[in-house]
Amino acid sequence: MVGLTVAGLDYLANCAVYVLDRRTGREVSRSGIRPLHRPRFGDEPGVGALRASAGVGGGRVSIEVDDDEDTSSIRVQARGVRVRLEVSRPGHDSPAVVVPWSERRFQYTLKDLANPVTGSVTLDGTTHDLGAGWAVLDRGRGRWRYATTWNWGAGSGVVDGSTRALQVGGKWTDGTGSTENGILVDGRMHKLGDDLQWTYDVSDPAGPWRVRVSGWMPRSRRSICATELGVLAVKTHQAFGTWHGTGVLDDGTEVSLDGLVGWAEQSRNRW
């Protein structure tokens, strides 16, 4: 599994890459910050090019994205890590919502699920072919509150010959009237409008994460990432594995979500 981050917080930029080998449990994480810099994002996902780098010397992380009509080419370079990805964008539905906290504070978020991806990861000179997989884009803009906690989970795959994906979130949207939850089936997004109930124990490395309505995910691996820079702090618990359960579509049809590969997380942030 490969995770990439390009973030602009007005007063600094962050670029990060995370690689997990689910078979061996090996993890590689690189992250860099660049004070007083803002990455230049396009107005819409899938439009234009992105060039971002943060960190200095051997700690620099560089991420480049080039988009055409239906494909994104991604290149990442960091100490001991090189990533090359080709992501197809099928043009299916994606959940996009604005979460309001006040008249001046809000966050727009878009989750683009179940995008076919191929590519390779090179670690310390050894190249690993990733084969065929799934990519998720998490794109957001807005004005966050200084201290925020969120849950986020997603999974993609093919079940009974049908391409399906799951998107679930919580905590940061509670009480706002907005949710970012839904089930994607063969290109159509079915919205889950209610707040979801998350049950998990971050101190139990063998325990499952359960989400009411969508199902549950036994983890194959846990990642804990923490950054503490004075007023800036991030601590994220992530669980990687396979989702099991069912979901109900707009017309009342119950569908299986068994076998969707993805993750669930809790993240506490001070920005």
Place the predicted regions along the sequence by residue.
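Structured soluble/peripheral alpha/beta segments that form catalytic or ligand/cofactor-binding pockets
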Residues: 1-271
